[in-house]
């Protein structure tokens, strides 16, 4: 036992030391690229800890001697340090050898896997320098081998197995696409393979003493005191030059959509590339990629909308892109163009020719618009931040108009369906920022936009001088979209024009356009956002009719939206979450995305007030009319108003009105009682009328409507008690002119609402007796109606409970027939034993059944 611990100078000690060195060397070879690129201090400390961990047994007690031996060896030993590039080249060569070995045995599954690995490895190398020539050799030889295999497959009868065939097809497709990027280099290699490979510079191996590695960082810091430089992976300084712009952009584009992509770092790189860009083509390509990356940054954020800072940067870059395209018309950004593949040189554009660059400025401005709306949706509308953010709409509108001028010019040069579609899309975006605004606001918006645009720019669709006439501007845009677009864009343009006309008190034009468009019939075929716009337009027409004093039209138009009780949802102004709703989280998310910003909302309290007021003017006279005409009892114009009125009447104590709804109901009760003055005072005291344009005019219209409907209510209520009634008396009661009262009474007589005649000689109304029912007769008719309703309900209940027992209660009295209950044996008897009166059978209907399971069982 003692020899194991104290035999320190034996051969076994030296052999174990050799083994430890062998293991440590093997561990160093297996270190990854990332660990190799750490600082020299960390590496030296790790090696020392590894050596210490390797001391076992007696070594741990003889540590001083071991350290002494190692220190002596370190003085004489040197370490070969390989750069990250050399290691990656070695990995590349290893992958190429695996591909060559797989080619010998025709293993295409391995070739496919290793080819993908080869491309990933070379992508890291290209980031720091040129493409390795050994990679060009590998892909050129692989393409030749693929072509040879294709020829062999045509001549041989032996087929590949499934995995081999799948790998071969994959490589055949990818090698062709991959080699397009290196066509020039592959041609050079195939012309003279030996000379091509000899031209490659040999990488020097840096040999340093191990102790010198500890001062590498200090030396680097001392040398870099003069300035800063960007350092990439492996400590290599990244240089941004005009020649490397396209390569950097290709790497960034290829990394889009991949996980763990640092988009902020990519944006910084492209901002530096933009500073060194030396040609318009470089600027255009960088801006196209940079704007797309900014929008990708917003997509991946947790807030689900673009920050104000990033939005303004994107807006500025879009403006710069449009300016560059306007200054250099030889470059055209269009969808569907072929991408320039050669990253080594710039495309040469001959005079008079046009180079098409793939991209879409229309999509950029649409996305910018969507991000602003999404941002406004998430900001509290009652804060100063919302007002400040809303001010950015001017910047957005400037870009929309400028992009419109650009695509409009392209469409004039070369007319095509995609370019016409781009014009339609931008025009629609412009219209959607105008249709809901008053003319004064639109005029300010247009003036500021044309001031910011260069003087040389103008539009053939909406010229610069059209900014002063807002109605003509909206009509021109809509007419253009009617002519050159179809489907959703055309329908939305029509709805926007109708909304604009209704907003500016042109009711009859808006109504006629809505009727002629036939959108009411097929609106269900459109998408949800268009249906929301339809609901908003319908509501705006109703509000316009109310402002014009057309009460019946207003109530009829608003009833579809307001009568449902779901105004918030139908107008996209809020979500009503029910306790037991079956809405999935995805559907709820979509609903929230469809919500309109607060500045586009229609005041729901004002909308409800107008709907209830219109219903009051129609329902109160109708209730007075049906009190003497029971056949009209079931006629209800507004169930919502009736329900609120009934609820209020059931209250034991009713205080003064506390809100808009209570004010309208209280006014309706005064009107029904014949006190039109109190009704007018109560209705005009509602403060929400001050939110409308020209509130004094609205209140005067309401007072006149209350006087007229009060007159109608009075005549319906007290007509049975009069023989004649003086028009002068009515004029004094309701503060209306005799001419107006005569007109109202004439209209009631012509519509057969009032059984009377107008005596113009005596200036009186003569009522006809015997037409209207008395109170007793009305009660009798009401009782008869209720009895019939009760009888029908009882019969329906009996049918439901005895369904399927038709023949069990059959009243047929044919001879020999097996009749119902009590007629099983002999004789013809009716139910209960009484013979039928007068030989008449029971009238059809009711309980005469014809079949069923129980009836069949009784027959048997």
UniProtKB/Swiss-Prot annotation:
InterPro entries: EIF3C, EIF3C_N_dom, PCI_dom, WH-like_DNA-bd_sf, WH_DNA-bd_sf. Residues 814-830, 848-860 have a biased composition (Gly residues). GO terms for molecular function: RNA binding; translation initiation factor activity; translation initiation factor binding. SMART domains: PINT. The keyword Phosphoprotein does not apply. Residues 1-79, 808-860 are annotated as: Disordered. Residues 16-53, 67-76 have a biased composition (Acidic residues). Keywords: Cytoplasm, Initiation factor, Protein biosynthesis. Residues 831-847 have a biased composition (Low complexity). Residues 598-772 form the PCI domain. The keyword Repeat does not apply. It is found in: Cytoplasm. Component of the eukaryotic translation initiation factor 3 (eIF-3) complex, which is involved in protein synthesis of a specialized repertoire of mRNAs and, together with other initiation factors, stimulates binding of mRNA and methionyl-tRNAi to the 40S ribosome. The eIF-3 complex specifically targets and initiates translation of a subset of mRNAs involved in cell proliferation. Component of the eukaryotic translation initiation factor 3 (eIF-3) complex. Belongs to the eIF-3 subunit C family. HAMAP family: eIF3c (MF_03002). This is Eukaryotic translation initiation factor 3 subunit C.
């Amino acid at each position: 036992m003692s020899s194991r611990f104290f035999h320190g100078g034996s051969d076994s000690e030296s052999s174990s030391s050799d083994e430890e060195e062998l293991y440590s060397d093997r561990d160093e070879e297996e270190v990854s690229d990332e660990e190799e690129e750490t600082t020299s201090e960390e590496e030296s400390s790790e090696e020392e800890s590894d050596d210490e961990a390797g001391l076992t047994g007696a070594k741990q007690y003889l540590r001083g001697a071991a350290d002494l031996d190692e220190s002596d060896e370190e003085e004489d030993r040197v370490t070969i340090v390989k750069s990250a590039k050399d290691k990656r080249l070695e990995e590349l060569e290893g992958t190429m050898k695996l591909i060559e070995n797989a080619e010998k045995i025709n293993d295409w599954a391995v070739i496919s896997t290793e080819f993908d690995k080869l491309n990933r490895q070379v992508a890291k190398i290209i980031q720091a320098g040129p493409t390795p020539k050994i990679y060009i050799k590998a892909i050129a030889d692989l393409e030749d081998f693929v072509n040879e295999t294709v020829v062999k497959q045509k001549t041989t009868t032996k087929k590949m197995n499934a995995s081999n065939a799948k790998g071969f097809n994959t490589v055949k497709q990818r090698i062709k696409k991959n080699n397009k990027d290196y066509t020039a280099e592959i041609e050079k290699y195939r012309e003279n393979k030996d000379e091509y490979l000899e031209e490659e510079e040999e990488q020097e191996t840096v040999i340093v003493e191990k102790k010198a590695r500890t001062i590498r960082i200090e030396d680097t810091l001392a040398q870099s005191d003069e300035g800063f430089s960007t350092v990439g992976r492996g400590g290599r300084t990244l240089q941004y030059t005009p020649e490397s712009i396209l390569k950097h952009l290709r790497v960034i584009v290829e990394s889009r959509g991949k996980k763990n992509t640092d988009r902020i770092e990519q944006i910084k790189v492209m901002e530096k590339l933009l500073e060194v860009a030396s040609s318009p083509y470089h600027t255009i390509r960088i801006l196209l990629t940079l704007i797309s990356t900014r929008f990708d940054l917003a997509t991946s954020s947790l807030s689900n909308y673009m920050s104000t800072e990033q939005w303004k940067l994107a807006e500025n870059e879009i403006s710069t892109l449009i300016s560059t395209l306007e200054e250099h018309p030889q470059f055209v950004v269009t969808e569907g163009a072929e991408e320039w593949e050669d990253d080594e040189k710039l495309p040469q554009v001959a005079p008079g020719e046009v180079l098409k660059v793939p991209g879409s400025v229309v999509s950029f401005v649409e996305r910018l618009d969507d991000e602003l709306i999404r941002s406004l949706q998430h900001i509290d509308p009652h804060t100063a931040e919302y007002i400040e953010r809303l001010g950015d709409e001017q910047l957005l509108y400037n870009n929309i108009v400028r992009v419109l001028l650009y695509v409009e010019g392209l469409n004039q040069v070369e007319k095509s369906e995609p370019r016409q579609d781009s014009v339609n899309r931008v025009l629609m975006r412009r219209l959607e920022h105008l249709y809901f605004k008053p003319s004064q606001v639109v005029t300010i918006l247009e003036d500021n936009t044309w001031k910011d645009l260069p003087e040389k720019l103008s539009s053939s669709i909406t010229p610069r001088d059209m900014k002063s006439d807002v109605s003509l501007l909206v009509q021109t845009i809509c007419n253009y979209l009617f002519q050159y677009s179809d489907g959703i864009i055309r329908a939305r343009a029509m709805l926007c024009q109708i909304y604009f006309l209704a907003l500016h008190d042109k009711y009859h034009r808006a109504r006629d356009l809505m009727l002629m468009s036939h959108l009411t019939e097929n609106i269900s075929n459109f998408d949800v956002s268009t249906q929301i716009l339809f609901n908003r337009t319908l509501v705006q027409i109703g509000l316009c009719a109310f402002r014009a004093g057309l009460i019946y039209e207003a109530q009829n138009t608003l009833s579809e939206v307001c009568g449902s009780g779901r105004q918030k949802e139908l107008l996209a102004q809020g979500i009503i979450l029910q306790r037991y709703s079956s809405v999935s989280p995805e559907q709820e998310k979509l609903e929230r995305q469809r919500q309109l910003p607060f500045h586009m909302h229609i005041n729901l309290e004002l909308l409800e007030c107008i709907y209830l007021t219109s219903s009051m003017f129609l329902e109160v006279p109708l209730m007075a009319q049906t009190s003497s005409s029971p056949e009209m009892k079931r006629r209800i114009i507004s169930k919502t108003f009736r329900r609120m009125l009934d609820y209020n009447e059931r209250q034991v104590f009713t205080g003064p009105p506390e809100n808009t709804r209570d004010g309208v109901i209280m006014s309706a009760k005064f009107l029904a009682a014949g006190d039109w003055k109190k009704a007018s005072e109560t209705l005009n005291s509602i403060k929400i009328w001050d939110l409308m344009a020209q509130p004094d005019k609205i209140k005067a219209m309401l007072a006149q409507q209350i006087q007229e409907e009060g007159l109608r209510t009075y005549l319906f209520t007290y007509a049975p008690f009069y023989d004649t009634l003086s028009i002068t008396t009515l004029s004094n009661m309701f503060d209306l002119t005799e001419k107006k009262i005569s007109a109202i009474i004439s209209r009631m007589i012509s519509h057969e609402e009032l059984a009377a005649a107008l005596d113009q000689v005596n200036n009186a109304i003569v009522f006809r007796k015997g037409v209207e029912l008395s109170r007793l007769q009305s009660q009798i008719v009401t009782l008869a109606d209720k009895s019939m309703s009760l009888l029908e309900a009882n019969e329906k209940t009996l049918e439901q409970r005895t369904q399927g027992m038709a023949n069990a209660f059959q009243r047929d009295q044919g001879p020999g027939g097996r009749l119902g209950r009590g007629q099983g044996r002999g004789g013809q008897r009716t139910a209960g034993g009484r013979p039928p009166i007068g030989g008449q059978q029971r009238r059809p209907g009711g309980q005469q059944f014809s079949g069923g399971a129980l009836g069949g069982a009784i027959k048997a």
